[in-house]
């Protein structure tokens, strides 16, 4: 129906009604049947039954079960960190799935939406998403949950959302989930907010799928998710850059002036030394702490609390490791960036798994990778597996169309179309 009377609300309604809320994952419902297990046991007598039962497919690829057995043996030997460097075609997602099911408690973090979709679609793992992905029931599905009434009204308004959650239950309240501290969170009614419903199911699932940005935020600040037996980090070669980005702090004068009616002095921006910046950060933090968050929107209150926490952490890091931080200032503001994350990786991410499994096709040097993340070499077990595809079957073919820089892309992009068509025709 393309009638002009159908507005934005209808778009959201169609989107959310078509979007299934992931159910709580059941490991028991995703084990292989007895006949398949018996067949695979006969074919792979050296592989433990637990591995075969939890493998997601009836036919393993060459070497997959042996890799899982190797990782499982390493965990039993007490290794805290497992680095699986496996080439394209190894089937790393099936390996991760089997181990997650075996240990019964795991997070799987991925970088790309494509890989998230693969895990969610192929293995039925619940993918937990942010508020912006769900339409607000209280707003008649005409806004997303990040802009719903519960996030845009101040605490002092005493707004009550019948679809949301609360720590203080009503008489007939249904338990939604327990947070990482053991605190209980309850639904307010029998009709559940889509955002909270999917999040509760993800918390209650033994295996949960997240992207890195959401996972780092949730685990460190929101605290609804606790530590699990396994933390499986896919595309792990990106972790150092991802942690650096999440630790980066930006302070812009236009934002400071709007929030706290203050700006960083021109003198500090131009010639500020470390001690000047530490004093500046302390003063800015105090000003944010003076904001009465009861009278501002919950979205802004969340941002203020987050800013205070990040500034305190930054001040502490600058005092402890001043040489590890780059201070990049201009006349509009300042950016603080860490040079290395080796002292922060464990506390900001790795501690949320009793055992951490890093997976990538491109680790290159596991010793340098371990050093960059501050891993104890005695706790690291490295497995390297070449791609099962021969070099002849994975050639690199250059077919250049031109430069793709911002000022050239308009000319170059059309030239790529026949090249892409040729590739698609060859492999259809």
Range-by-range predicted roles:
Residues 106, 427-428:
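Conserved strand-helix element at the start of the C-terminal RecA-like helicase core
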Residues 186-205, 219-222, 298-403, 407-412, ...:
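A contiguous, basic/glycine-rich beta-loop/short-helix subdomain that forms a polymer-engagement track
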Residues 77-96:
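Walker A/P-loop
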Residues 70-74, 93-105:
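Walker A/P-loop NTP-binding motif
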Residues 27-30, 37-52, 88, 105-206, ...:
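A substrate-engagement module of RecA-like helicase motors
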Residues 1-15:
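Single conserved hydrophobic/aromatic residue that forms the stacking wall/gate
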Residues 37-83:
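Conserved pre-motif I regulatory segment
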Residues 101-102, 117-122, 190-207, 211-295, ...:
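Signature of the SF2 helicase/ATPase Hel1-core->accessory helical subdomain module
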